[in-house]
Curated annotation (Swiss-Prot):
The protein's name: Flagellar regulator flk
NCBIfam families xref list: PRK10715.1 (NF007987)
GO cellular component: plasma membrane
Natural source organism: Salmonella typhimurium (strain LT2 / SGSC1412 / ATCC 700720)
This protein's encoding gene: flk
Record keyword Transmembrane helix present: yes
Length: 333
C-alpha cells in the first residue's frame, strides 16, 4: 500500500502542539515594547545602561547572554523587571529624603537637634542607621519646625570691621544667592550695606557678620522653595527665632500683609520679612550692649554726708554744731 498523497508522514496522535510552537517563537512586538518601557524607567533611576539591564535580567532567568528571549520567557522577564523597578523607585525616594535632610542639617543648629532626636527616639547616632520611614519622619518634623532646636552659642559682638576670612565667607554666600536668584552680586552687596546702615566708604562691622550670614543663607534656601511660608522661613534661619521674635514677626506679617502662617509668601514679602528680622536683631543687640548707669538702690548715709560736706565748707557753723551736739549729749546723760 502507498500513503495517500499529501498526508503527513508521521504517526497518528503525534501532531505538533500549536501552543508549544507559539511559546518557542521570539518575543512579539508588543511583549518587547512592554519590557523596553520597564527598562527605560529603570535606567532613569539608576546608573545602569540598557544592555546591562538586559544582561542582568537574562542572568536572573537562567538564559545565556547570547541566547534570544522567547515568547515563553516574557512573564518571568516582566516580573523580574517590575521587581527591579520597585527596588529602584524605593532607593530613589530614600535618596531624595536623605538629600533634603542633609541640606536642612546645614541650617542653624538643625544638625544638633536631629542628632539629639534620633538618639532619644531611635537609639541611633547616624542617619545611615535609620530606616526609610524613620528618615521620612525626621524630615517631616524638621520641615514643620517640630524639633527642639538648641540656640547657637553667641560670640561677643565687636565694633571692629570684618576680617578678610569673614568677608570671603559672605562673598561666597553672595555668589551662591546670585546663582540661585539671578540677582547680581553688586545688587546683593548693596542691599547688605543698606541693611547694615553703613555709609559710603565705611566697612561693615564684624558684629553684624552672623546676622548677614543668616540673612544670605535664608534667602538662598527660600529661593529654592516654590511655596515659602512663615513656617519654612523660620526653618531656613541659621539662627532660629526666639519665641518673642516669632510672635513679633507673625504680628508684623499680619499687620503689613494680612497673611497667616500657612499663607504662601511672594519673593518681595520673603525679603521684607528677612530684612525685618535682621533689623530687629541688630537693634536688640545694640540695646543689650548699651552701658547702664548703675547706682545703689539705697544710700542711708547720703543726707548725713551731704550735711558734713556743707558744714566743712563753713568752719564757723561746724564749730557751733559741734557745741550743740555736745550739749545735747551732756543733757541726755
Amino acid at each position: 500500500m502507498h500513503p495517500i498523497s499529501g498526508a503527513p508522514a508521521q504517526p497518528p496522535g503525534e501532531g505538533r502542539n500549536p501552543l508549544s510552537a507559539a511559546s518557542e517563537q521570539p518575543l512579539s512586538m508588543q511583549q518587547r515594547t512592554v519590557l523596553e518601557r520597564l527598562i527605560t524607567r529603570l535606567i532613569s533611576l539608576t546608573q545602569q545602561q540598557s544592555a546591562e539591564v538586559w544582561a542582568g535580567m537574562k542572568h536572573d532567568l537562567g538564559i545565556k547572554n547570547d541566547a534570544p528571549l522567547l515568547s515563553r520567557h516574557f512573564p518571568a522577564a516582566e516580573q523580574n523587571l517590575t521587581q527591579r523597578l520597585g527596588v529602584a523607585q524605593q532607593n530613589h525616594a530614600n535618596r531624595q529624603v536623605l538629600s533634603q535632610l542633609t541640606e536642612l542639617l546645614g541650617v542653624g543648629n538643625n544638625r544638633q537637634a536631629v542628632s539629639d532626636f534620633i538618639r532619644q527616639q531611635y537609639g541611633q547616632t547616624a542617619l545611615s542607621q535609620l530606616t526609610p520611614d524613620q528618615l521620612k519622619n525626621v524630615l517631616t518634623l524638621l520641615q514643620q519646625g517640630q524639633l527642639s532646636i538648641p540656640q547657637p552659642q553667641q560670640r561677643p559682638a565687636t565694633d571692629r570691621p570684618l576680617l578678610p576670612a569673614e568677608h570671603n565667607t559672605l562673598n561666597q554666600l553672595v555668589t551662591k544667592l546670585a546663582a540661585a536668584t539671578g540677582e547680581s552680586n553688586k545688587l546683593i552687596w548693596q542691599s547688605m550695606l543698606e541693611l547694615s546702615g553703613v555709609k559710603s566708604g565705611e566697612l561693615i562691622p564684624a558684629k553684624q557678620f552672623t546676622h548677614l550670614a543668616t540673612w544670605l543663607q535664608a534667602r538662598q534656601t527660600l529661593s529654592l522653595q516654590h511655596a515659602p511660608t512663615l513656617h519654612t522661613l523660620q526653618a531656613a534661619l541659621k539662627q532660629p527665632l526666639e519665641p518673642d521674635e516669632l510672635t513679633a514677626i507673625k504680628e508684623y506679617a499680619q499687620h503689613t500683609y494680612q497673611i497667616q502662617p500657612q499663607t504662601v509668601l511672594t519673593t518681595a514679602q520673603v525679603q521684607d520679612l528677612l530684612n525685618h528680622i535682621f533689623l530687629r536683631r541688630v537693634e536688640r543687640e545694640a540695646d543689650e550692649l548699651e552701658p547702664l548707669s548703675i547706682q545703689p538702690i539705697y544710700r542711708p548715709f547720703a543726707p548725713m554726708i551731704e550735711t558734713v560736706k556743707n558744714l566743712s565748707a563753713r568752719p564757723g557753723l561746724l564749730f557751733i554744731a559741734l557745741i550743740i551736739v555736745l550739749a545735747l549729749f551732756w543733757l541726755v546723760s
